[in-house]
Design a protein with these regions (language model features):
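Transmembrane beta-strands of outer-membrane beta-barrel pores
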Residues: 134-136, 153-155, 169-171, 180-182, ...
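Outer-membrane beta-barrel strand-turn architecture
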Residues: 155-157, 180-182, 225-229, 265-271, ...
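Periplasm-facing N-terminal accessory domains of Gram-negative outer-membrane beta-barrel systems
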Residues: 1-32, 372
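Signature of Gram-negative outer-membrane beta-barrel scaffolds
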Residues: 322-435, 450-451, 455
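Transmembrane beta-barrel wall of Gram-negative outer-membrane proteins
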Residues: 170-193, 207-243, 251-279, 315-316, ...
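Short strand-turn segments of transmembrane beta-barrel domains in outer membranes
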Residues: 117-120, 128-138, 147-178, 186-193, ...
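Periplasmic N-terminal accessory/gating domains of Gram-negative outer-membrane beta-barrel systems
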Residues: 3-5, 9-13, 17, 40-137, ...
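Extracellular loop and loop/strand-boundary signature of outer-membrane beta-barrel proteins
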Residues: 160-162, 205-209, 244-250, 258-262, ...
Length: 458
């Protein structure tokens, strides 16, 4: 019984009878529970423009076509502006969409949208939390100059099987949490698909889109294993596919793919390490077959491989050091234009492939100097190197780059460092508390972005 001490008695039964046993009360010690207020924490923190978003908050966000969307939460934050109605793309304080770094379990998501931007590319049921930094960006993040959106997937229940499913106007989804080894290993499986073609059928004939089609699906899995209290390993997988056509002769499609692994190691009470490695992929294609003799396929893709290590060293009760590095190898197929079908006279054209290496080292220091004054300072040093094989032109000195001013063509061999760009990035934020409920913050960031998206706005 509750609050009753276990008692054992040895009994020899010879006949029917009654035995009264006196039980003693006991006390159960509960683990300490700390309850904090988010508003008070915001006053105490040195971070500016940082928000932590959780799926439980989604109920307060308007739904698009019956689907909850974590990116809609992002768009509702100060300084964030949507790029269009019912769209999941966003701009942060005047920045462009390609100046936002979107991470899912350490992997880069290049296109976070489904179905013309009506839905986010990831199922909210598999999201544990999302952190967005619009200013005072920690030194561990880099590569974009506007904002960082870091999304973490949740681990499945390690004790019992759970699942959920949903059917909406245009989408259906399934989420399963499967324990493999109790309290040690679990697998999360999440999937979502659409049956949105019926929307296109409702459009008037004169729109030209009545015979169009559109659809998507995404799949995610998280395998979590706990070796012991000091070591754990998570393996992540994610894939999304979109296809749409405005008519039977013009088709579009794109895909996201991420695979990564993360190992957490507690070296001692003051030093924790996180080690990650993974692969990210994004591709896009467009097929035009309205005229068989001019039918073509246009495609490009981005592939990147990354390794990273992050360390947290607790120097004192209110003094923490963060340091680490990240390195990414890019393979970019800038574009392929080729005939579609045997009757096409289109001449195949393949742009040169780009290869680059981006590496950064960082050091951050969080220090509560006094109960009133806290400082978060950091430095990140990044390097971006364009690699061979590649051919490039040399132009006449003092002349603008043009075909008529080309003086030579230089070919760089495989793996050769053609050009390296590098420099420091400084991060600083401070907080001074006048009272327990009122503080003033200030911050400064310098950021570097080496890869950009060129958009056709004509």
């Amino acid at each position: 019984g509750l609050n009753i001490k276990d008692t054992r008695r040895q009994i020899m039964l010879y006949s029917d009878g009654t035995l009264d046993i006196e039980l003693e009360e006991t006390t159960h010690m509960l683990d300490e529970v700390t309850i904090t207020s988010g508003r008070i924490q915001n006053v105490k923190s040195t971070q500016l423009g940082a928000e932590t978003l959780r799926p439980t908050q989604l109920k307060n966000i308007p739904m698009a076509l019956g689907e909850v969307d974590i990116l809609k939460m992002v768009q509702a934050l100060p300084g964030v502006k949507t790029v269009g109605e019912a769209s999941s793309g966003f701009n942060v304080r005047g920045g462009a969409t390609d100046q936002n770094l979107i991470l899912l379990n350490d992997g880069t998501i290049y296109n976070p949208n489904h179905l013309f931007g009506f839905f986010a590319a990831f199922n909210s049921d598999m999201v544990k939390e999302a952190e967005i930094y619009k200013s005072s960006i920690p030194a561990q993040y880099g590569g974009r100059i506007s904002s960082i959106l870091d999304i973490t997937g949740k681990e499945a229940n390690k004790e019992k099987f759970t699942g959920s499913a949903g059917i909406g106007l245009v989408t259906s989804k399934l989420n399963l949490e499967i324990p493999i080894i109790k309290d040690r290993t679990s697998v999360l499986l999440s999937g979502r698909t659409t049956y949105s073609d019926w929307i296109m059928k409702q459009l008037p004939e004169k729109s030209g889109y009545k015979n169009g089609t559109a659809g998507f699906y995404d799949l995610a899995t998280i395998v979590a294993h706990k070796f012991n209290d000091k070591h754990s390993l998570n393996v992540y997988g994610y894939y999304s596919h979109d296809r749409f056509a405005f008519n039977s002769n013009e088709k579009y499609g794109y895909n996201n793919l991420n695979a990564s692994a993360r190992w957490r190691a507690v070296f001692n009470e003051k030093l924790i390490g996180y080690f990650s490695a993974g692969y990210d992929h994004y591709d896009y294609n467009n097929r035009e077959t309205v005229n068989a003799s001019a039918a073509y396929k246009l495609s490009f893709d981005i592939n990147q491989y990354f390794v990273k290590a992050d360390f947290t060293n607790i120097l004192a009760d209110k003094h923490t050091l963060n340091f680490g590095f990240k390195s990414m190898l890019y393979h970019i197929n800038s574009g392929t234009y080729e005939p579609e079908g045997s009757e096409s006279f289109v001449k195949k054209d393949v742009l040169q492939k780009d290869k680059a290496l981006e590496t950064a080292f960082y050091l951050g220091d969080e220090w509560e100097i006094t109960p009133k004054l806290s400082v978060n300072a950091g430095i990140r040093y990044s390097l971006f190197s364009a690699l061979g094989p590649r051919s490039y032109y040399q132009y006449a000195s003092g002349m603008l780059p043009h075909e008529s001013t080309i003086t030579d063509t230089i070919t760089a061999g495989a793996g050769k460092f053609m050009k390296t760009y590098h420099g420091p990035e400084f991060r600083l934020s401070a907080r001074y508390a006048f009272t327990d409920n009122f503080s003033v913050k200030a911050g400064f960031n310098s950021m570097r972005q080496y890869i950009h998206k060129l958009s056709n706005t004509v």
